[in-house]
């Protein structure tokens, strides 16, 4: 179960736009992510880092904001984020989402993102 201080440290790293570093530092080796209940992205931490780096490489800028304080209940954490993306090609857009995380100790084991896909033009 993560402490408030642990979750706050994770959030601070993400808000600093060190997204790949946050995966490296805060996710279990066998972690997976899921978008809006699509198939989970498996392959572990290194694969998640690779995918995140590829996403960021398509952007000129990403502004990361914490919209509300995290909710921590045992091994579960919910975080409401806003990301404003400026792609190298295309229009700038913002997305709000809730990340639902399951932690094992001080690391994230699973994470599902819930958002309206229309925010990304989908």
Where are these regions (language model features)?
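Alpha-helix C-capping/helix-to-loop hinge sites
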Residues: 10-13, 34, 62, 85
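A beta-strand edge to alpha-helix "cap/lid" segment located at domain peripheries
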Residues: 49-122
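A solvent-exposed, acidic/Ser-Thr-rich amphipathic alpha-helical stretch
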Residues: 2-5, 20-75
